[in-house]
Structures are given as C-alpha cells and as structure tokens.
Amino acid sequence: MKLKVIDNLKEKTEPLSHSEAGKLVALIRRNTLDVHQGEYRLEDLERLVAFATPEKIQEEMNRGYLAMLFADDENLIGCVLVVRKGLKLVIKTLQVKMSFCRKGHGSLLYEQCENLFRLMGSNEMEVEVPKFPSSQAFYQSRGFVKTGNPTQKDLSFAMFKYI
C-alpha cells in the first residue's frame, strides 16, 4: 500500500493534477453508487456526489487536505478529503473501494484525519455523513454523534466529536 498526501490547508503547496482529480471523482462516484445502490433513488445518489467533479475537487484542494491510498502505483483504492468551512475543518468524504472494505483501509484514512485535526490545533471534528447505516456506524464506532443538522435535503447529516 502507498499513501499520498497533499496538504494545502495552511498554504497552497501542491496542486492536484487533473488526472488525479479524475481518479478521485471516479472512485467517489463509483463507490457511492456501488455500495448504496437500492438504498436511495439514483437521482438522490447523484445529488450526494454532485461535488465530485474534477474542477470542484481541484478547487476544494486549493485550501484542502487529501490523502489517497493506492494498492500499487496506479490503483486508487481509497481517499479522504478534508475542507475548510469557515474557520472549521470538515471531513468532506472518506471513501474505500468496495472490494477493499473491512480490511482496515478506512481506519487508516480516518486516523490520518484525526492526526491532522490535532496538528492543526482543533479539539473537535465534524464530518458530512450520507444517511447510510454503514457510514453512520463507521463514525459512531469512533465516538462521533449526530448533531441533528440535516444537509442536502436530508440525504446526509453532520456528525461531531471532541478529540
């Protein structure tokens, strides 16, 4: 496994290439559709991944943090994107390719985030979570609680944790 990190939270130090942005978009969109097919209508799933275009991902990365997990030099199997919302940092998405789930890869990516939040001096974490039972369970097992702030017309909600 290979972990690649791009950290532009304090200042833009490294751009995200269009090619890498395309790989991220493909992972986010394919993963959301594969994992949650049947739980929501296709148009609802499309709304959940509307942020996943190469241009929007590149824009988020101008002041964001991205960790990408590769099985080899080319095979992207997971990612986590942290963005700024005002003064706060928020986990925008954490994705692991379905065939690599439940093998510790999501935990590895999450731990990158928790370490980042601590290094940035934050004592709290927030994440935007699609209303999928598996996503909610993942974060609850790490101490997050629902804040009750629905987003995207009730397709997702925020979860919060003190660190």
Task: Explain the meaning of each model-derived region.
Residues 126-136, 152-156:
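Conserved beta-strand-loop-alpha-helix junction that forms the acyl-donor binding cleft
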Residues 3-11, 15-19, 26-93, 97-98, ...:
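Acetyl-CoA-dependent GNAT
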Residues 75, 93-111, 118-120, 130-137, ...:
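Conserved glycine-rich acetyl-CoA-binding loop
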Residues 89, 103, 157:
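Glycine-centered loop/turn positions within well-structured domains
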Residues 123, 145:
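Short acidic/polar active-site loop segments enriched in Thr and Asp
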Residues 160-163:
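Short beta-strand-to-coil "C-cap" segments at the C-terminal boundary of structured domains/repeats
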Residues 49, 157-158:
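Short, solvent-exposed polar/charged micro-motifs at secondary-structure junctions
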